[in-house]
Amino acid sequence: MTFKELDLIEPILKALQQTGYTTPTPIQEQAIPVLLKGKDLLGCAQTGTGKTAAFAIPLIQRLYQSDHKKGIKALILTPTRELAIQIGENFDQYAGYTGVKHAVIFGGVPQKAQVDALKRGVQVLIATPGRLLDLQSQGCISLKGLEYFVLDEADRMLDMGFIHDIEKVLKLIPARRQTLFFSATMPSEIEKLADSMLTNPEKIEVTPVSSTVDTIRQSVYFVEKKEKKDLLLHLLKNPEIESVLIFTRTKHGADKLARILNKSEIGAEAIHGNKSQNARQRALTNFKDHTTRVLIATDIAARGIDVNQHSHGINYELPNISETYVHRIGRTGRAGHDGIAISFCESEELPYLKDIQKLIGLQIPVVKDHPWVTVEGEKAQAGKTEELKEKAKANKVYRGSKSNGDYWRRKKQAQSRQGQGRQSSDRKASGRQG
């Protein structure tokens, strides 16, 4: 199936074509027709499955085809500023030819720029709960005309203690609305919240990306931030690294790294959302033709890249969303070719590495024989193997379908056995102490 077969309007198809999207992911294929009909949706899907486009594209289309009344018509609530920014960047791409305007608001930064954006008028508001409630209480936001509400990563919202904020938001928005509810997991608390928010929803479940390609050799280098560029230049002296795709978290970081490499006479170009379509296409063509040895990309830009035969992928900065790692390294080793994925990890990125290894269920081999290795990194990596093995073992115990209850039943059984094991150990320890 193609996006054209989903009955999308021409301005959106044009934007998707420029982004490089041709084929919808499973969740997009299932969700877009449902949402275009105006139905509520309950989606069990993780970040990395394409769920942002699954709700953003139909929202943009319905707003484009509406009567264009003023005011905020769609609210997307997210747990973190990083996710809010990422969703905002997606809207930049998909809504570019529609005139549908959006704003992103989150805490931890001054309010003025966000308030100014709201005053200019937006139809879509992407927000974290705290800043949304702050600005609403100050009279900067009115949600009375809201028609669409998206709650993203609901389980993470609960983990972070946002349940009361969500309840406050629900009191501020109209009861008659289309509601989209996404969660990576569906424990009883989430099901209860979903039931209170949704009306006869369509239910969609998408298996998350959790395994990496077999033909890819992975490794991690522990290195401090200020020495990453030196390590990269050291590695690029190896002529076997013929064609390399490097990932950064920010557009500024991509541009800066391209300048560093070009200054060292290593042909490099950056590709990201601030580049014009012609500039992105030129950089991509140069990389495919091997005119340029290094292509540096942000994750948003990389989703539109179709390159099959680069030898190496380098995570210059680890992604803060673990599923993104799987998508990044999946771009090497395509079409039966062996790929090599190298990751740089500074001390502040250790939590990201831990999440990545938990997701893929293995310990990424550490390269220690380089001049910039950090002792802190080696210590943090030590002792993780058994933990990951146990995690993988537990996953196998309760693997099954979430929709028919097998997954949750087996998970509960596994957790019960683990709890009994801990109680037995406690009793033995107590006996020894007595």
Task: Locate the predicted segments by residue.
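Basic Arg/Gly/Lys-rich low-complexity intrinsically disordered segments
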Residues: D289, L359, Q363-G434
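Conserved helicase RecA-like core
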Residues: T2-G377
